[in-house]
Amino acid sequence: MSEHVGERTRPTSLRYDDVQIGDELPPLEIPLTRTLIVATAIASRDYQDVHHDPSLAVERGSPDIFMNILSTNGFVGRYITDWAGPDATIRKVAIRLGAPNYPGDTMTMSGSVTAKEDGVVEVALR
C-alpha cells in the first residue's frame, strides 16, 4: 500500500476497518549474520559478552554468540509496523524466551489478527 506524494511514494497505514480477525500477516525472513547479531546488541547497549564474543559464549555454555532479546523485540516492532504502516502504534509486546537465534539462523516471523476491540487490533506472532 502506498500513496503518491508528488514524485515520492509514501507508505499508507491500515485502518481499523481494513483489518479482520483471522487476517494473516505476510511472513518475514531475516537471515541472521554474526555482524547483525553483534551490531544490534551494541545498538541496544547490551554489551554482554555472549552477544559478541564466541569463545566466551561457548565458555558460558552456548554453542556460539546469540541475539539478545532487545534485538528480537525491535524486529517484532519492525514486522508489525511494516504490515500495519507508519501510523500504527504498538501498545504492547509480550515475548517469551524460547530457542536462541545464532549466526546462520533465519528468523522467520508470521502472525495473524486475533482480536479487535475499541479501535485496538491484537496480533499473535509465530
Where are these regions (language model features)?
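Hydrophobic beta-sheet segments that form the core/acyl-binding groove
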Residues: 88-126
